[in-house]
Amino acid sequence: MRLLITLGPSGSTHGHSLHTDAGRRRGGRPFAQVVDELRAGQRVRTQGLKGAARGHVLARLHGALRAPLVCVAVDEEAADALAADLSFFLGGQGSLLAPRVLRLPADEVLPYDEVSPDAAAVTERLGALFHLGQGTRFPALVLSVRALHRKVLPLAVMRALAARVAVGQDFDRDSLARRLVRMGYQNSPLVEDVGTFSVRGDLLDVFSPLYDKPVRLEFFGDTIESIRAFDPQSQRTVDALKEVDLVPAREVLLTDETRPRAESAARAVADRINLPTIKLREQLDALREGLPGFGMEGLLPGFFEDGLSTVFDFLRDWSPEAPVIYLDDPLGQDRAADTLWEELERSHGAAEARQELICPPLEHFLSREDVNQRMQSFRVLEGGGLSLAQTERPPVHFSFGGTQDLREAILAHHGEEGALSPLVERLERWRELRVACVVACGTLSQADRLKRLLMDRNVMVKVHTEPLEDAVALYEPSIRAHLFTGEVSHGFVDGPGGLAVLADEEIFGARARRRPKRSKKLDAFGSGFGDLKEGDLIVHTDFGIGRYAGLTKMEVNGVPGDFLVLEYAGRDKIYLPVGRMRLIQKFSGGDPTQVQLDKLGTTSWEKTKKRVKEQLLKMAAELLQIAAARKAHPGHAFSAPDRYFAQFEADFEFEETPDQAKAIEDVLADMQKPEPMDRLVCGDVGYGKTEVAMRAAFKAALDRKQVAVLVPTTVLAQQHFLSFKKRFADYPVTVEVISGLKKAPEVREILKRAKEGKVDILIGTHKLLGGEVAFKELGLMIVDEEQRFGVKQKESLKKWRSQIDVLTLTATPIPRTLHMSMSGVRDMSIIATPPQDRRAIRTFVMKYEDTVVKEAIEREVARGGQVFFVHNRVESLPSIETQLRALVPQVSIGVAHGQMGEGQLEKVMLAFTEKKYQVLLCTSIIESGIDISSANTMIVNRADQFGLAQLYQLRGRVGRSKERAYAYLLVPSRRAVTKDAQRRLEVLQNFTELGAGFSIASHDLEIRGAGNLLGDKQSGAIAEIGFDMYAQLLEEAVAEMQGQPPKVQIEPDVTLPMPALIPDDYVSDVHQRLVFYKRFSQASHPDEVTDLRAELVDRYGEAPDEVDHLSELTLLKIDMRDLRLRGLEVGTTRLVVTLGADALLDGPKVAGLVQRSKGVYRLTPDMKLIARAPQGASGQDLISEAKKVLRDLSHCALPQA
């Protein structure tokens, strides 16, 4: 039987016959024709091949021809979309080592732009070239016109430098390290970033661009004994490997071979352009130092004997089966090539005028003629758009149906409970026509959400966790939709193929696209001891604030040990054994230059601690009082989220971060309780706090309750109004704002409607707290940046807190330690995970040039955007303003700085948010909460004078929309920047993923945040005693107010007759030694000690005896802390345990132990237990004896111990 039904766009009945015969379904005449013509070696033109249908057809083409595909798109954005479509139909993107769809990215900058290219793009390109050069088999390579024209590292160089290293292979470790330097890797004490390596003893760590994790090679002599992948954050092994491929880490390779060639190329260019000797010397110095500075890319072809290679050279050797080249939108590609060459000529001309040392464009890029000529030896398929090339036959027509009408039908019902009805009806119609429907969901959680929404409507769906392998074999009569994770550009209907594909964006609206990236958690373990430098302030629990003066070796009773030298007022010193590092913290929380050192032998430190503790007890009492009043006051218990709420959640255009999802869960759980909510949500700008507030507001509106949103400034009021309005546009929720911008009659009208219950969400400044504002049924108050309100406003907020649900938001990061200390008195949710890059901010480090500034501003303004120009000196702002007005006279410029009056500053900021200015020239004052999605370029002048954390905060002000954001970090010429600053600027360039340097810098921001949250008085206390001590005292105060017994903390003093330390020749980096000492001293469970020793072995090789002794000493201390014993002295003839008055021991039981021991134990009047050591015992025997003594004492412990 043959069933004939016709199906056109979106399921309408015309267009193609649809057969039940699976074989015919797979073919389809246009497809078969394309296959036949390509097999015959012809250039094939198609029409109607666009969107995700391209991926579908190309994937089938790969299967039919068994040939790899080289897919060329107009630009990088189009290449990303094409790669996503292909990945979806080719069974996923694969991994870095076994790719299925590989991207060969181009640089956004030209070699003459004085800007080093984006490091992530460089490493991704080198990885792709390696795979091509090695002949790795994979289905598809995707690149843009620019990447196809751009010349690349010579194939011979890639092959000569790349190294495959395997377990069991003989390889001289030092020669491998030298080879890595030649390949552009940088030696670093800790391997956290791509392109770095480190040598320690028998270990070599290296992070190759081919892997998403660094690897650790362990040598035995010259033989590689093991290869292990490790986590760059924890530095611990995660996987064992048999072999590893090492590829060049950068393109500007300054090696012994390339440097002389680069120098002679530089001299030749200098002679041709008559370059002054001083300028030539500066460039040659940079080359000799091996510093890849700005603009060195322009000379790159001169580094190699035969110049650079082309992508075609790599393609020729890639696959035994000649690849098929697919040109997407050939006419668009012609235009892109024209534009590229226009930009090249212009940029080259400008560089020549600046007398830069550069090679001509044809040495960097292929001409259009070259590309066309080289393409003639490949089979070519054209699709999408028009073509200018002549082909022997007319174009092959594909006529896929679209899904636009379905999108429009869903939009027409958006915000209503039945919004998904058009989708449900369409799925039913497709099922009747035996069409399998596939939905590409951006994430697994989005797939689960859509499944719930459809299952609620009795629609059977299936969520697939594996990538899509064969779309044609999917049809199942009972399943209406198959949900896969992945992205497609937009949907299509293939009637004859029995397949309909939808993007989740067509159901829920546009979502932010992301490219996968190497993950890096931002967390500074070891409480900042990894960067403790001589001269830094520390806080000792018993002696107060001192200065760290280094790590030194000393002998005590003939036993060597490591000691921290701590300096106090009057040059007094303490030598602290590393085993007692638990007693100190790095000082943070105030200006180090204003801090006074404590004086040893006085009571001043104890008095300060006592005073702060009294303050804290008062604060804790107040907080607990508010919490108690809240619990006593019955509030409104909101209903649980329903189907309609789930639809609102699904409309969120980003994937929730784990912290954000947890905050939403916390808030909704609080709202469902009968007592009023009082929750604080902390998170940096852009971390998604507003969405948490919007979910709470929607829940309140669904329960017919009104919401007040209180903000500190008119600017933020206006911003929140616009973002709430946009988010609730498709729902029956009324949002209004009252602020200084509204005329009095308008305000009166809004207030009247609020009183009548006709306004669901009212946003405003402190005016909302005034007597003239009344609500019919207020159920939720959202407070943004509470610390910026005055005392009076804070007092009225206290009154509200015990009556209705209050949700407070703050952009200031809050440290986890403070969060822990305050648990029980303040409900807090911390959003510490940054959102996955909407699109990574392109960060350029470059020399200040007027042309750079002019082009950056003009480029942003031309696409309708705005620019922040940050200059941190108020006194020179007017001269910068004059300079900018001369450079870009047609652009409107606003000026903002902290010395302006608040009203004036607010006016300028508001005008900028309303797009009345295109450029905002400002100091680093840019308001913390400000979110201007149209401002996507930031220029920072003298970036070398900013700290990492400050630059991170600034940079977070751009990149808040789907537009690509740019950050230009401008520095003076190379001569004015120190070598150290230059290396730091390289870190800044890889800024999309910050390493430990940022984690530590962020600590300071958190401390500032703690002060903001707790108020000025508490900031003063933090500055006086340091943050960690403050958090500890706060925890004690809260426990005391809650009636818990005070914790007695004892730090036992243990001496062993053998060295217990980490030898310098085992861990040579002093910072890493300090981190390990700190972690050993903090260990509170035997498992932690076992893990620490295992980590040392993993990272540094087999542990020497001294490390084993340190582990044993730490284990003894853990047992002693449990019993609150003060000291233990292990000698060759006896062991002495100092019990002390706080010991958790039962006196009679200890006396009984001594009596039963028959002279082995004796107790002295000053509470010391002396045990006789076995004759001739030493080393491990003595430690075993010490453990036995502590075990005996544990049998005498008081019941509560």
From Swiss-Prot:
GO terms for molecular function: ATP binding; damaged DNA binding; DNA helicase activity; hydrolase activity. This is Transcription-repair-coupling factor. Couples transcription and DNA repair by recognizing RNA polymerase (RNAP) stalled at DNA lesions. Mediates ATP-dependent release of RNAP and its truncated transcript from the DNA, and recruitment of nucleotide excision repair machinery to the damaged site. Residues 852-1006 form the Helicase C-terminal domain. It comes from Myxococcus xanthus. CDD domains: DEXHc_TRCF, SF2_C_TRCF. ATP binds at G683, D684, V685, G686, Y687, G688, K689, T690. Transmembrane segments: none annotated. It holds the Pfam family UvrB_inter. Residues 1-27 are annotated as: Disordered. It is an enzyme of class 3 (hydrolase). In the N-terminal section; belongs to the UvrB family. Keywords: ATP-binding, Cytoplasm, DNA damage, DNA repair, DNA-binding, Helicase, Hydrolase, Nucleotide-binding. Residues 670-831 form the Helicase ATP-binding domain. A motif (DEEQ box) lies at residues 784-787. InterPro entries: CarD-like/TRCF_RID (IPR003711), CarD-like/TRCF_RID_sf (IPR036101), DEAD/DEAH_box_helicase_dom (IPR011545), Helicase_ATP-bd (IPR014001), Helicase_C-like (IPR001650), Mfd (IPR004576), P-loop_NTPase (IPR027417), RecG/Mfd (IPR047112). One of its GO terms (cellular component) is cytoplasm. It is found in: Cytoplasm. Its main location: cytoplasm. GO terms for biological process: regulation of DNA-templated transcription; transcription-coupled nucleotide-excision repair, DNA damage recognition. Its EC number is 3.6.4.-.
